[in-house]
Amino acid sequence: MIEPTPDFTTPPLEAKAGVRPWRENGYRLEGTVSSSNPRKYIVHNYGHGGAGISLSWGVASQVRDLVRDRATHTHDTAVAVLGSGVMGLTAATLIQELGLKVTVYAREFWQDTTSHVAGGQWAPSSVRYSDEGKFKDVLKIAYRRFESDIGKGFGVSKKFNYTPAPDPYLDVVVNLVPGLIPNPVPMNLPFEHLATPGFRYETLLVEPPIFLKKLNDDLHRNNVEFKQKTFANAASVLSLQENIIVNCTGLGAKDICSDPSKLIPIKGHLALLKSQARLTYLFSRNGHLFPREDAVVIGGTNRVGDPSTNPEPAVTQQLLDHIKGVFGVGPIVPLPRIHIDHPDNWPYVATEKVSGV
């Protein structure tokens, strides 16, 4: 079977840029009691790099457990969740299922978050972790929850991902949690102008515009209140009326908590082409291409230390020129150094275990 080649003849619908919250010592997930006000208990959940959607349900379950244990001890009934990206929304979902009163405080709501700019493949990319056992649990819980949501309006579907080289992010899953996803199948890639040796993986596609909207809508239906608020420092967080606070602010955590680990912005670009229903596969490891209901997503890039969310036309064109060459419908051009798959970017895109803080 030959898979259809993407149509690159029409200009992009739009270009987008988002900023991944990459934490040098691994993502942070822990509960702490405030030294200045012992009644305040803060669960920190941030620094997930490019793996936010992939890990979301898994880390949210661990956040919920910390909140439940604290509420059982203190008899608090109200919880503040800071942030309305995928980490905040999934955490709020599981916490409100405990019967607690949840209020989400956020500077930006779901349409304007980094999560909304994500490509959506389930593959834990560009993230460091410090506890292998907990990370395995996160992977298992997250994947199985997404898998159970197929066909329920969450924008989740199973997909083949064709790659010309091993995919290190999916291989992490294969190696750490055998059997969670199928092992990759070596094969000649099934494309008219790209019949080189490669691999076929099987994973999930989570479409952020559908998934985030569904979470947001369900929370509103369950009487979770949303309030727009910016937190400038730790004092502004501790001034909240809730005693249990869940910090899912991503890069915003730099402003509100003392953290010795580097929390670094990593800018990524996407180009969105018109949706093409005939494309039912994913492609990665030499450029990536994720056909979704709203668009065909072309990515991605990796600019370390850049906090800007402004798309750059020249970078967008580089992405398009490169992927056209890969699929044999344009001149072959070298992989841009800014591309996430370029070897120079590996120190910041690898998913690996570190000694965490």
Predicted regions and their residues:
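Helix-loop-beta segment of a Rossmann-like dinucleotide-binding subdomain
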Residues: 39-48, 128-132, 155-161, 181-214, ...
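Short, hydrophobic alpha-helical segments
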Residues: 64-71, 150, 224, 327-331
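A non-catalytic, amphipathic alpha-helix used as a structural packing/dimerization or gating element
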Residues: 137-145, 214, 318-322
